[in-house]
Amino acid sequence: MEKDNLPDASLTSNQLQKYAEDLAKVYQSEREKSKDLEAANQQLLKYADDLNKTVLELKEAYLDTIHRLALAAEYKDEDTGEHIIRMSRYCALIAEKLGLPAEEVKNILYASPMHDIGKIGIPDTILMKTGKLTEEEFEIMKTHTIIGANLLAHSRAEILQVAEQIAISHHEKWNGTGYPKGLSDDQIPLVGRIAGLADVFDALTSRRPYKEPYPIEEACEIIKKERGKHFDPDVVDVFMENIDEILKIKEEVDSADNALRSGFARSVRD
């Protein structure tokens, strides 16, 4: 082989050195990029954590506002704070045992306290009357369902949409003799059927200025007798199957301190 055909060793060495230097620069650049990416990632994680905390605070403020609106509707009722917590938790338990998805259970938990928000529009002379209402007064009282639904209508918030359904339908009856529309059977939204039973049970078993609470056994008998009349049979069955849990909720709320009662979002979450 002739000498001229051999590769220039010095040239090859220079090229290899240049390649090595270039690779080192690329490696260093990638290391710096990796550090920058890691720093950016850590910053994003911090932003995400801060955002999650802000969202949680906003949600709790939103739920607390809902609770206070519900309280405003029944402000003169000394038991209303306990009532809306008990009733909402009864609703959530029934919904869960009926097999509703977790998100729907949460919605009814947070929406049901607004079932009587329309009472804001009912005159105190009727709302606070301790004796039996006249026929005319009762017709006025019944309008709280429509007033409540109107107050809650046209919201894009899912919880308020559920609350609207409950407000308008929780006094409907399975046999069609309820109000305001005289709906029957499955015409009544499920959330209204659930809230209607929970509301009646809590009213029966709670002390009011005009009555003593019914004994639990008697209240349960009334609920069972109204199966297929006032109440959805399936809702009654689930309610009675889980009466021990219902009574546990009642005991927890009745024995809770004032701090627990004042924080609805915290109370229902616990």
Model region roles, listed by residue range:
Residues Q28, K35-Q42, K46-L63, H67-D270:
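Metal-dependent catalytic cores of enzymes that make or break cyclic nucleotides
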Residues M1-L45, D49:
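N-terminal membrane insertion elements
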